[in-house]
Amino acid sequence: DWRAQHVKEFEEEILQYKKHGLEFFAFWSVHEEAFRLFEKYKLHPQIWNMFPSPKADTQEARVAAAAKAMLPLVDRTKKLGSKLGLYNHGGWAGEPDNLVAVCKYLREHHQAKHVGIVYNLHHGHGHITDFEKLLKLMQPYLHCINLNGMNEGAQPKILSLGKGQHEAAMIATIRKAGYAGPIGILDLRNDTDTEVALREN
């Protein structure tokens, strides 16, 4: 994630990653300066973004409209050589059934095999009880799973691993399913230094 004040630091961030042997794995949303730098340094990070929740008379029409809205970014990420991760962030667009439907639509109708799903536990508190079923549905399309401590009702929403009631079982479910893709830890706490937050996980 980033804010306007971080834009001037984009290039230095890339240089520091290179200096310390770190992969620039993913970038949130779209920014022209970032995309220019990706081309300059020949980087191909995953691009994570949400699709809209359009109003339509049928589920099929909503899926098609959501997919159509993503087409400029679908084409741009393909040219960049980057995977595009549809990001669950609540609402209709954050439901696994809809993430899969939009992903399938883009792959089948627009040859967008680089499009997949980024599933965030911290936006999935409503999926705790049926996580195994939903993981199976999403698994063929997953680009990354981001972990989080998980309590009922998102109390609190952001929680270090090992401090919640449900994340151990959810991680066991991920292992049992044979998921072998990237696993992420996000630092979403403004009150804690990033190094401290990541080490806690």
Which stretches of residues belong to each language-model region?
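Histidine-acidic metal/acid-base catalytic patches
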Residues: 71-75, 79-80, 96-201
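Surface-exposed, active-site-proximal loop segments in enzymatic domains
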Residues: 9, 13-16, 37-38, 51-64, ...
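N-terminal pre-domain/capping segments
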Residues: 1-44, 68, 108-114, 139-140, ...
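Hydrophobic faces of well-ordered beta-strands that scaffold small-molecule active sites
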Residues: 1, 22-28, 43-49, 84-86, ...
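Alpha-helix N-cap/loop-to-helix initiation residues
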Residues: 3-6, 31, 59, 92, ...
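Active-site acidic/histidine proton-transfer and metal-coordination neighborhood
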Residues: 31-117, 123-126
